[in-house]
Regions:
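Short secondary-structure boundary/capping segments
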Residues: 81-84, 113-114, 366
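Short, amphipathic C-terminal "tail helix"
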Residues: 354-367
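Conserved beta-strand scaffold positions in the cores of enzyme catalytic domains, especially
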Residues: 96-97, 320
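C-terminal substrate-recognition regions of SAM-dependent nucleic acid methyltransferases
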Residues: 23-24, 103-273, 280-332, 336-353
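SAM-dependent methyltransferase catalytic region
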Residues: 1-96, 102, 124-128
């Protein structure tokens, strides 16, 4: 398929994740640099992606371009601009010729969340837009059945992101010293370490002073905890006074069908730090328990894997997970165990035996 020269160029381009370029009159091949050495604002935990700029530049230089680069944008994930992601996924001249979820198989001892891909862009050919990318034909087939039946109703519509809960001006009025104790620019954020940073505003036990208190679910020294805080110090998020399912905002590494780390139902009057995101704003605990069963099931987590290719969990990751009716009027019998619920969902969406086997063998069972 490739000439000797092409194979040599491909081997060289894959030799290092730091970047290499090869151009010929007919085709440009490259392994562009992936990110800046220094992160955003000096934040060493974040590095700004730049490979998208090199991809744009390569397309201007040649009609035919073959590149190896991080694959996150194929799932509309990562830190490349969302508009750029959508443009790439809508480009009929772009095709994916190789995908590897485990980057260390391509670049030894190098972890690139979301894997790496080799893409081929040819301005003279129409491959059809990628649209929604998955590396599994079986999952593509399942998506083709599920998406029309969703009628635009996804679990993402009732998901609440991990950044929803914030401090109010009332807290800063009563505790003016707090701003100086928190990171610059984050005086209103409930960061994962906020309970340890400003312990004076939290209480292990509910004070008996007659004030209205809520609980904040967070972590202290790697242990999950509930701490009381005056309700006026926290903004009124849509599910604060409702039942919901909390789950970690980061779980696993983005592999197909991996378990979610200890999701659980929370009642009214419980919010969270940025360690957790949530699903639902339910009137009853039974609805929340049904939603928890759904999330634990293999069907829902298989579809979550379409967009969850890193550890991060955001509402958008649930875009291809169908929203269900979690009330007693549902077409699903939620009294069944999780495996029985999955069987009902397979039938509801008309999955074939092969598609069911794919889910059952690729998605891990949760307790």
């Amino acid at each position: 398929m490739y000439s000797t020269e092409s194979r040599q160029l491909n081997r060289a381009a894959r030799s290092s994740p730091r970047g290499a370029y090869f151009f010929s009159p007919c085709i440009a091949r490259a392994n562009p640099p992936y990110q800046e050495e220094v992160g955003d604002g000096g934040n060493k935990t974040y590095a700004t992606p730049i490979y998208n700029k090199f991809i744009e530049g390569a397309y201007k230089l040649s009609d035919k371009v073959e590149l190896i680069h991080p694959a996150r944008f194929l799932f509309n994930a990562g830190s490349t601009p969302k508009q750029w992601n959508r443009e790439m996924l809508s480009d009929p001249h772009l095709s994916v010729v190789f995908y590897e979820a485990s980057s260390s198989r391509v670049f030894i001892n190098t972890e690139i969340k979301g894997g790496v891909a080799v893409t081929y862009h040819d301005r003279t050919k129409d491959f059809g837009a990628i649209g929604t990318f998955t590396p599994y034909p079986e999952l593509n087939a399942i998506l083709r059945k599920v998406r029309p039946a969703m009628d635009g109703k996804a679990l993402s519509s009732i998901a609440v992101n991990s950044y929803s809960y914030h401090f109010t001006d009332a807290l800063h009025r009563d505790y003016p010293e707090v701003e100086g104790m928190l990171s610059k620019g984050h005086a209103y954020d409930l960061k994962s370490n906020v309970i340890e940073k400003i312990p004076q505003v939290f209480h292990k036990e509910k004070p008996g002073d007659g004030e209205d208190y809520i609980q904040i679910y967070g972590r202290v020294q790697n242990a999950r905890v509930f701490m009381y805080i005056k309700s006026e110090y926290i903004n009124n998020v849509v599910n604060l006074r409702k039942y919901k399912v909390f789950l970690p905002a980061a779980s696993g590494n983005g592999g197909l069908g991996e378990e979610l780390a200890s999701p659980l139902v929370m009642g009214p009057g419980v919010g969270s730090t940025e360690t957790f995101c949530s699903i639902g704003a339910f009137d009853t605990e039974a609805e929340a328990q049904n939603a928890l069963k759904y999330i634990k099931g293999k069907f829902a987590r298989a579809l979550l894997s379409v967009l969850k290719v890193t550890q991060h969990i955001t509402p958008e990751k649930f875009t291809y997970v169908p929203l269900q009716d979690f009330t007693p009027a549902s077409d699903i019998d939620w009294s069944q165990p999780v495996a029985g619920i999955d069987r009902q969902l397979y039938a509801k969406y008309g999955l074939s035996d092969e598609e069911i086997t794919f889910i059952e063998t690729h998605v891990k069972e949760m307790e």
